[in-house]
């Protein structure tokens, strides 16, 4: 019977395909009631929400080995997001569907970087995006760059809480298509009009994200003034309602941390659905601070972002939605309106629905109902890979994006698929119980070598959790080190090394791997780390770190910068690094980390990593 198990699964898969094809639908359909475009009680206005696309236009192609068979499938991609939107437009009529994005759409993916953001701009123009706000990573670019993109857009960029101090402009401070808010007029088939007011909000980068004028392109934003979120929302909402808005939505880059176990279940949600709680652990959560003080009736819904988590939740009776990063999902908020006795359309808040998270997939795993990258072991729980349909229509590459493929794909593929290096000599990349990590150590050694630094240290998050021995392409290097990060060096004393490393290891949740350092740590019962001793490897031999001696430290711009929220931006580490940055003593490369690393490993052929974790020369040593 066990031997027959794979064949039974194949037979079941064949039956599913046959039944689906007989019904005219290829694959799995949803097991919930969808919103009827011709509902007799309400006029529904669908609002599509995406956020944190981070420049990922093309899908990621995954390969997993199941026995002797290799499964190939795609994860994410705007070609599938476009298909959902156009199916929805067919159902409701294009005039009734609105599409908004919550920001962070340029910075990240190789396609956006390679083509200077143009591929993202072209997509939003072609698909007919109605509006966006800007996220914290839009501030990574020079202000003139963002303004040029906004001015070329066919949609509105909505940011209400800013003003340019030099020109005193509010509307238009970010370019020709920048508005503080906008009323979208939806003409119904009976010629009635429903007005949706949308207010854009972004982070106060000089407060919430601590944007200094010393790091890279962010100096070009120095003349920007940020207003209070609450005051701006209340005043603008009142203004929009006086202008006839039947509902007011906040388009933001704010998000919540919510329980993802329940949240990732695809369903049609309402305010009484069990969705999984959202947590108030993050004391810096802008959205919770806003929700705690906002008055009822100011905002009817929120499109968010930033946390890279699924959100289809109601907090303080306000529906909110955001999705995980990299164009892997989208949500749809359905706003129901009903005419009152005076003939005015009133939003029926209690009947608002959110459909999602909708997976951007042409194939999904039957049980998990998504197309995330999984291991061969996880395949048994995820279920067989089947074609996917939504509302009776197959999800596939929408033909509207074909001109963008014709324009960009060949050049992208040629660049991305360059072979750089083959890593071997290990079963897989993993962190052992000491905190040492093979891939971390490999890259940190390279960074120290490139910059001829005494040591290098970077947070764990920059490296993937797992990697099997393989040949890495140019795209692999980029994906492991995205966001245009750069290698930076700074001279520090031995005493400063102890303060910096002591801070980041004690306040951080994960280990900070390093090159040429031995960090001896104690961990208490609560998991809190304490650095007991730091020593330096010089030509393989341990040396004491001398307090008044100068050493060259290498790290990344993102990790060192106080904008990152990383542990370098805390305590004594912050005081040391921030002062050196102000004094222009932090020197950053002109090239990005992925460029420098690809150049470093190019031509090395096969690299054996078997000795990158050496028990006799530990980099992180846990004192029992």
Residue ranges and their predicted role:
Residues 1-10:
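Classical Sec-dependent N-terminal signal peptides that target proteins to the secretory pathway
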Residues 7, 15, 21-357, 434, ...:
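Acidic, metal/ion-coordinating pockets
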Residues 15, 24-84, 90, 212-230, ...:
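Catalytic centers of hydrolytic enzymes
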């Amino acid at each position: 019977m066990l031997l027959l198990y794979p064949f039974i699964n194949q037979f079941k898969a064949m039956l599913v395909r046959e039944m689906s094809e007989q019904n005219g639908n290829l694959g799995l359909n949803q097991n919930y009631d969808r919103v009827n475009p011709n509902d007799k009680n309400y006029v529904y206005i669908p609002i599509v929400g995406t956020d944190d696309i981070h420049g990922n236009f093309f899908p990621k192609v995954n390969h997993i080995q199941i026995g002797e068979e290799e499964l190939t499938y795609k994860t994410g991609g705007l070609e599938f997001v476009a298909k959902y939107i156009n199916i929805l437009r067919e159902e409701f009529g294009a005039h009734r569907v609105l599409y908004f994005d919550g920001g962070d759409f340029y910075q990240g993916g190789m396609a956006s970087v390679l083509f200077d953001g143009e591929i993202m701009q072209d997509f939003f123009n072609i698909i007919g995006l109605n509006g966006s706000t800007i996220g914290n990573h839009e501030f990574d670019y020079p202000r003139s760059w963002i303004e040029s993109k906004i001015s070329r857009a066919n949609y509105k960029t909505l940011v209400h809480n800013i003003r340019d101090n030099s020109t005193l402009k509010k509307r238009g401070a970010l370019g020709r298509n920048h508005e503080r808010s906008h009323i979208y007029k939806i003409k119904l088939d009976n010629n009635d009009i429903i007005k949706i007011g949308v207010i854009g909000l972004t982070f106060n980068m000089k407060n919430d994200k601590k944007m200094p004028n010393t790091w890279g392109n962010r100096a070009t934003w120095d003349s920007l003034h940020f207003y209070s979120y609450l005051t701006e929302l209340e005043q603008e909402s009142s203004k929009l309602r006086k202008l006839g808005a039947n509902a007011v939505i906040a388009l933001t880059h704010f998000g919540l941390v919510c329980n993802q176990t329940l949240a990732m279940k695809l369903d049609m949600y309402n305010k009484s659905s069990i969705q999984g709680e959202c947590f108030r652990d993050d004391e810096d959560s802008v959205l919770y601070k806003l929700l705690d003080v906002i008055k009822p009736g100011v905002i009817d819904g929120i499109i968010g972002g930033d946390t890279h988590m699924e959100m289809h939740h109601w907090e303080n009776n306000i529906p909110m939605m955001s999705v995980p990063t990299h164009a892997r999902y989208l949500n749809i908020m359905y706003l129901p309106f009903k005419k009152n006795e005076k003939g005015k359309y009133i939003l029926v808040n209690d009947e608002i629905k959110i459909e999602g998270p909708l997976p951007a997939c042409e194939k999904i795993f039957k049980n998990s109902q998504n197309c995330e990258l999984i291991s061969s072991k996880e395949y048994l729980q995820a279920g067989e890979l089947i074609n996917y349909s939504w509302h009776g229509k197959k999800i596939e590459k929408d033909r509207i994006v074909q001109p963008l493929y014709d324009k960009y794909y060949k050049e992208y593929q040629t660049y991305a698929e360059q072979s750089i290096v083959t890593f071997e000599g290990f079963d897989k990349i993993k962190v052992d119980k000491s905190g040492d990590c093979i891939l971390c150590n490999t890259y940190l050694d390279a960074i120290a070598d490139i910059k001829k630094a005494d040591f290098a240290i970077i947070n764990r998050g920059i490296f993937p959790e797992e990697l099997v021995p393989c040949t890495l392409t140019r795209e692999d290097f980029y994906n492991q080190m995205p966001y245009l990060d750069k290698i930076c060096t700074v001279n520090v004393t031995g005493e400063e090394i102890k303060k910096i490393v002591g801070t980041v290891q004690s306040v951080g949740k994960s280990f900070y791997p390093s090159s040429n350092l031995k960090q001896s740590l104690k961990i208490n019962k609560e998991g809190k780390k304490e650095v007991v001793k730091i020593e330096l490897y010089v030509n393989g031999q341990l040396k004491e770190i001398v307090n008044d001696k100068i050493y060259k430290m290498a790290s990344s711009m993102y990790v060192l910068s106080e904008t990152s929220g990383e542990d370098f931006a805390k305590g004594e580490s912050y005081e040391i690094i921030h002062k050196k940055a102000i004094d222009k003593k932090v020197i950053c490369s002109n090239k990005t980390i992925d460029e420098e690393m690809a150049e470093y490993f190019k031509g090395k052929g096969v690299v054996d990593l078997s000795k990158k974790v050496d028990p006799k020369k530990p980099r992180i040593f846990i004192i029992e």
